[in-house]
Amino acid sequence: MTLSGQTMPLEARKCQSLTGRVRVPGDKSISHRALILGALAVGETRISGLLEGEDVLNTAKAMQALGAKVERRTDDNGGIAWSVRGVGTGGFATPEAPLDFGNSGTGCRLVMGAVAGCPIRAAFDGDGSLRSRPMRRILDPLELMGARVISQSDGGRLPLTLEGARDPLPIVYRTPVASAQIKSAVLLAGLSAPGVTTVIEREASRDHTELMLKHFGADIVSVAEGAHGRKISLTGQPELHGAGVTVPADPSSAAFPIVAALITEGSDIVLDDVMTNPLRTGLFVTLREMGASIEESETRLDAGEPMAQLRVKASRLRGIEVPAERAPSMIDEYLVLAVAAAFAEGTTVMRGLRELRVKESDRLEAAAAMLRAGGVAVEIAGDDLIVEGRGRVPGGGLVTTHMDHRIAMSALVMGCASDAPVKVDDIAFIATSFPDFVPMMQRLGANFA
């Protein structure tokens, strides 16, 4: 739905093949963190490849409201870079108005952590979707560190007002679920605390915050904890220094053209500079297990993050079982994986998807509804999603997006190879993470109308 209140429907029709070379937008997780740490650093941070979607732009506005200077610059060759002049650790100022994060749970929760370590008061708000999402798991550890929730909606939901700690306490905190957002909020609050703040995870979540904190000069150590977990220790009150950041292409965004190419006969595409951090590439591992042709080349590192060029060719996929412990490394990709499973031969079982129920929508139910709209046999058993692949998808249905960008893009990918067109009721929210999705897919050969 647009700002004027009008919906933006779109139909995807079967296309001949997808071919070409593109770079999907910059990684959303890295973009948020680069802006926030740049704002907490001393000096200038220059960011190239920043995702200029609504979610990230709302974080940039929040950093300005908290006292940092944020500018978008264009060089003589037309290249775009963002400049952030920070206020130093603990230096945020009280904002004059509520911080509005729109649809972005990541931006909102990370900034809550940063504010919790500063002696200020800030109000947090968002759109209807974000207001429905739980914040209590973020607020609980922040209150242990000395922050106070002054006002909140039912169950710790937005809108709420948070008062940061004047003297933040370092804590040892065991996350109740594998969540990079909980971990990151605690670490960002811990920047202002004397001593060592420690986060212990039973299942390792994405480690972008740890890598970027180190890039900005923080003293942070991460070691294995148990079979699959991590123990992260941050020494507080560092002086972070502005740094250069090149944002790699977002693997969660790359997932859509990748799956579209795999299921569309004759396709052969190349994606440049895609992040290949092993804590984010569960989808690539899973698709390869299903028989996908995904080749990596030109690998390199920037700010501790690995990236590579990916070549993807149409492939015959087969159904597999996806273990629950893989969920943290691909939590945002299950919707489009469900599309791949629908085009595979055989049954695909995706285990342990409870966290999908508290995303922008109940993505577990939404995934099943999307596939049923396309004529696919699908079942939810507890927290598991079971897809009966037949090698083809009839299509012909209407998919309701529930204001969720990933439902919209996944449904359009399904329509690229289904027998009959697939219609999406509203694509407006795609702009939160992948503003150029439709024209980029059309350049590759997608048939959207």
Curated annotation (Swiss-Prot):
Phosphoenolpyruvate binds at K28, G105, R133, Q181, R363, R406. Gene3D superfamilies: Enolpyruvate transferase domain. It is found in: Cytoplasm. 3-phosphoshikimate binds at K28, S29, R33, S179, Q181, D332, K359. GO terms for molecular function: 3-phosphoshikimate 1-carboxyvinyltransferase activity. Its EC number is 2.5.1.19. It catalyses: 3-phosphoshikimate + phosphoenolpyruvate = 5-O-(1-carboxyvinyl)-3-phosphoshikimate + phosphate. The active site is at D332 (proton acceptor). GO terms for cellular component: cytoplasm. It is an enzyme of class 2 (transferase). The keyword Amino-acid biosynthesis applies. It holds the Pfam family EPSP_synthase. NCBIfam families: aroA (TIGR01356). Belongs to the EPSP synthase family. Catalyzes the transfer of the enolpyruvyl moiety of phosphoenolpyruvate (PEP) to the 5-hydroxyl of shikimate-3-phosphate (S3P) to produce enolpyruvyl shikimate-3-phosphate and inorganic phosphate. This is 3-phosphoshikimate 1-carboxyvinyltransferase. The gene is aroA.
